[in-house]
A protein has these predicted regions:
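Flexible, compositionally biased loop and terminal segments
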Residues: 1-151
């Protein structure tokens, strides 16, 4: 049994949470909806999570959102995923900045549309001095590729 002081110690130790945003398309398909609707619902859930974390002591949140392997999906689906990133940065940046969130996007930018790369750079630049939650978005990312690039 954990006593009250032990629970507080555990809470203090959590400083980084990483989430793999997977299964949204399957969730939508299982409900007879287009896969995109699942991804859009995932964005709604992410917004709620970020608002819930606003006053938390969490230091880092890493979101694995789009793997390099996701390029194997149909072009229509990858285009809609790009639209979601575009929408997230465009619509949510002001609120995130006002909540002192620092944004960093990791992953290869070479295949990402230029306008999205510009949005990413702008978000990172605007929030670089923020000292609250560090939101790291792994987009067009591969851990394996990162290891290969490091060697």
């Amino acid at each position: 049994m954990i006593n009250h002081s032990s629970k507080n110690e555990i809470k203090k130790q959590i400083s980084h949470i990483a989430l793999i945003m997977d299964g949204n398309g399957r969730w939508a398909s299982s409900r007879g909806l287009p896969r995109y609707e699942g991804h859009a619902q995932g964005l709604i859930t992410l917004r709620k999570l970020l608002r819930d974390l606003k006053d938390s002591k969490l230091n880092y949140l890493t979101l694995f959102t789009f793997s390099i392997d996701n390029w194997k999906r149909p072009k229509e689906e990858t285009s809609k995923l790009m639209q979601l990133l575009r929408k997230f940065i465009s619509n949510d940046l002001s609120e995130l900045h006002n909540n002192n969130v620092r944004i960093r996007v990791i992953g290869s930018r070479s295949e990402i549309p230029r306008d999205i790369v510009d949005l990413i750079k702008g978000a990172e630049s605007l929030t670089v001095n923020n000292t609250g939650l560090y939101l790291q978005i792994a987009f067009n990312y591969s851990g394996r590729q990162e290891i290969i690039n490091a060697t």
